[in-house]
Regions:
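Alpha-helical segment proximal to the catalytic Tyr-Lys
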Residues: 123, 168-169, 233
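Residue(s) in the substrate-gating loop at a strand-loop-helix junction
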Residues: 138
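Active-site helix of classical SDR
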Residues: 118, 155, 163
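Short C-terminal tail/terminal secondary-structure segment
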Residues: 224-225, 236-251
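Short, small/polar-rich loop/turn modules that mediate ligand/substrate recognition or access, typified
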Residues: 84, 171, 176, 235-237
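Substrate-binding pocket helix/loop in short-chain dehydrogenase/reductase
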Residues: 80, 94-95, 102-107, 201, ...
Length: 251
């Protein structure tokens, strides 16, 4: 029986790489994103490679839409085997400009957005006695802070709490919940000079990473694929740092 995986923020970056990785192992992948062109593009790539995928537009701030997407998948396939809660934003905002609205906007997507997708899918997973949930945190949520990103660090630290709480609550029902805390990964977000390191900053950081480079989206996707597999059957409640050794080498 083909496994069914739902991924948020799957149009670009880590989400896109994860969609392709799970499709390559044989999953039917439901690609969701607010970026419709990017989402449909990765679906086409997966299909061209012989995999199964579909696109559904989803803004994770929309509770009703999240419920509808989950219900539609469960109605057609009978289940969702894996949820990868990946959608997120990371905008640089100096503290004096960090209004309640900007704080809430980040939390609404980066933390609450995960709950909106997970919550309606849990009943079916519990009834079947199986399921894997993987949430994307960040090294800024588990290891250190970064100036002008206090809202992002706080939200990603909240993801760690979400993973632990859900793991305990759902473990007795056969549902595993884990997380990944990526380090510096070569995505459009990282290469943005407005909100992150930019190309030159990325090169500088890569030079101090013990493994000698910044990460690629595939480096994270492979860990997500492991956590979603039976190879991780006795692993739950953990957030795995994948940063090329940056935090142990520098902090």
């Amino acid at each position: 029986m083909t496994s069914v995986s739902l991924i948020t923020g799957a149009g670009i970056g880590i989400g896109r790489a994860t969609a392709k990785a799970l499709a390559a192992r044989g999953d039917h992948v439901v690609v969701t994103d607010v970026l419709e062109d990017d989402g449909r593009s990765v679906v086409q790539e997966i299909r061209n490679a012989g995999g199964e995928a579909e696109f559904q537009h989803l803004d994770v701030r929309d509770t009703d839409r999240a419920k509808a997407v989950v219900k539609d998948i469960e109605t057609r396939f009978g289940r969702i085997d894996t949820i990868v809660a990946n959608a997120g934003i990371a905008h640089r905002v100096p503290l004096e400009q960090l209004t309640d609205e900007k704080w809430d906007h980040t939390f609404d997507i980066d933390l609450k957005g995960m709950l909106r997708v997970i919550r309606p899918a849990v009943a079916n997973m519990k009834a079947r006695g199986s399921g894997a949930i993987v949430c994307l945190s960040s090294i800024m949520g588990v290891a250190y802070g970064w100036d002008e990103h206090v809202h992002y660090s706080s939200a990603k630290a909240g993801v760690v709490g979400l993973v632990r709480g859900l793991a305990v609550e759902l473990g007795g029902h056969g549902v595993r919940v884990n997380g990944v805390a990526p380090g510096y990964i070569r995505t459009a977000q990282l290469l943005s000079e407005k909100h992150s390191l930019g190309p030159e900053g990325a090169k500088t950081v890569g030079d101090i990473v013990p493994l000698g480079r910044i990460g690629q989206p595939d480096d994270i996707a492979d860990v997500v694929k492991f956590l979603a597999s039976d190879a991780a059957r006795y692993l739950t409640g953990q957030v795995i740092t994948v940063d090329g050794g940056l935090t142990v080498g520098r902090y």
